[in-house]
Amino acid sequence: MERQVQRLRQTFRSGRSRPLRFRLQQLEALRRMVQEREKDILAAIAADLSKSELNAYSHEVITILGEIDFMLGNLPELASARPAKKNLLTMMDEAYVQPEPLGVVLIIGAWNYPFVLTLQPLVGAIAAGNAAIVKPSELSENTAKILAELLPQYLDQDLYMIVNGGVEETTELLRQRFDHILYTGNTAVGKIVMEAAAKHLTPVTLELGGKSPCYIDRDCDLDVACRRITWGKYMNCGQTCIAPDYILCEASSQDQIVQKIKDTVKDFYGENVKASPDYERIINLRHFKRIKSLLEGQKIAFGGETDEATRYIAPTILTDVDPNSKVMQEEIFGPILPIVSVKNVEEAINFINDREKPLALYIFSHNNKLIKRVIDETSSGGVTGNDVIMHFTVNSLPFGGVGASGMGAYHGKYSFDTFSHQRPCLLKGLKGESVNKLRYPPNSESKVSWSKFFLLKQFNKGRLQLLLLVCLVAVAAVIVKDQL
C-alpha cells in the first residue's frame, strides 16, 4: 500500500494533475464513464440495495452528473487567483489568494448510496488538482467491484486508484500519510479515521450521521408535510444519513400524522409494500437484526412486519415513544419512524438541544418566523424547512455535519475548497525602502505611530482613491525618511 501511495505522490509532484485543461479532461472522462456504462452501474447499485434501476438513477447517478457539470462550468473561476485587499504599506504590491491542490487524498465511501457518496467527493478532488485513492465500502460489494473495473479505464491510473477490501485494507490505508481524508459513515469509525489522521496531522472531513429531528407545527398543511416526510423517511428503506429520524409534534396532531403517513405509504408502494419495486431492502443481516431489535417494547401504530430471509422491514411508525428508550438513543438508519409528543415549539427546541447536534433538521410550519426561530435556537449540519432531504441536492449549499454529526463540508464549490489550500501570495517590489524602514530596528514611538497609519488603513481600487493614496504615501514616505 505504501508503494501505491508513493506512486501517486510522485505523479502528483510531477505536476501532471495541476493544469486546468487536464482537470477538465479527467472530469469529462468521468462523465463519459457514467453515461457509457450507465446500465452496468445501475445494475450494481440495484444488486447491492434491491433498488430499482429507476431509483438508482434518480437517487445517485443524476447527482453525480449534476456535480460534474457544475465543476466543468465553474472550474476556471474556482481555480483562478482572487485579488486580496491591501493596506497602505502594500498598496503598490500584488496580493492575491491562489487555490492549490493538497496532494494525495483518501476518500472512504459509504454503502447506503455507494455510487454518489464515493464519487461525488472524487469530483471535487479531481477539480482541485489532487491525486486520489478511493476506498468504496465493502458492504456494497457490487458497486465497489464495478468502480474498480471502470475507473482505471477512464481516469489516469497514475493519479486515481480504487482500493477494495474490508477492515484490514482500510486499516492499512489509514497507516499511510495523506494530505486530506474524507470519510462518510458512522461516528465510531469516524473516530478511528480521525485518530489515524492525527498521527500525520492530516486534515479530515467527516460526514457522519445522527438522529435528524423533524418538528411538525400544528399550523401546517399535514397532507403535504406527511407526504414529504414519508418520501424522505422510507426512501432507500430508511438507510439515508439525513432521513428524518423521528418526529416531534403536539399530542393533538399525532393521530392525524399517523393516518396520513399510512395513507401515503399505500399511495407510494401499494397495498403490498413488500412487492413494490420502489421499496428497497436492508443492506445485510447484521443491520436487519439491529433495526428489528429497536421494535422491542415499542407501541407499533403502523407496520412492524419483518422477513429475515429477504431482509424486509415494513415502513413502521411508533407512537408514545419514551425519549429514553433504545430507539431514541441511536441513529435508526432504517424504516422505523418514532413520534415523540411535545407541548410546544419551546419544548421541541429544548428536546433537540439536549441531544447531540444532528446532521439535518426539518421544520414544517406555515409560520416562517417559527421556522427561523427553530433555526436560530438550535444547531445542525443542515436545515430544510417544509421539506426533507432536499438541501442535499443544492450544490451551491455546503453539505456536512457539526459536532457529533461530522466536520467539514463538500458539494459544488465547497468540494473544491475542501480539497484545496487557499494560498496567500504577496509580491513586492524592491523599491520603497524608506517606508520599509518602519519595520527595521531600532524601534521608536515615531515608527509605531507611522506603522499604525500604514497597516490599519485598507483601500479599494477606485481610480481617484488610488491616485490620492499614491500621493499620500509618497508624501508620507518623504516625511518618514526625514524623521528616520
From Swiss-Prot:
EC number(s) per entry: 1.2.1.3, 1.2.1.94
Main location: membrane
Statement: the UniProt record of this protein carries the keyword NAD: yes
SUPFAM superfamilies per the UniProt record, alphabetical: ALDH-like
GO terms of biological process kind: aldehyde metabolic process; central nervous system development; epidermis development; fatty acid metabolic process; formaldehyde metabolic process; hexadecanal metabolic process; peripheral nervous system development; phytol metabolic process
Record: active site: E207, C241
Cited InterPro entries: Ald_DH/histidinol_DH (IPR016161), Ald_DH_C (IPR016163), Ald_DH_CS_CYS (IPR016160), Ald_DH_CS_GLU (IPR029510), Ald_DH_N (IPR016162), Aldehyde_DH_dom (IPR015590), Aldehyde_DH_NAD(P) (IPR012394)
Topology in the lipid bilayer: Single-pass membrane protein
Subcellular location: Microsome membrane; Endoplasmic reticulum membrane
Matches recorded under PANTHER family: ALDEHYDE DEHYDROGENASE, ALDEHYDE DEHYDROGENASE FAMILY 3 MEMBER A2
Protein role: Catalyzes the oxidation of medium and long-chain aliphatic aldehydes to fatty acids. Active on a variety of saturated and unsaturated aliphatic aldehydes between 6 and 24 carbons in length. Responsible for conversion of the sphingosine 1-phosphate (S1P) degradation product hexadecenal to hexadecenoic acid.
Protein name: Aldehyde dehydrogenase family 3 member A2
Lineage start: Eukaryota, Metazoa, Chordata, Craniata, Vertebrata
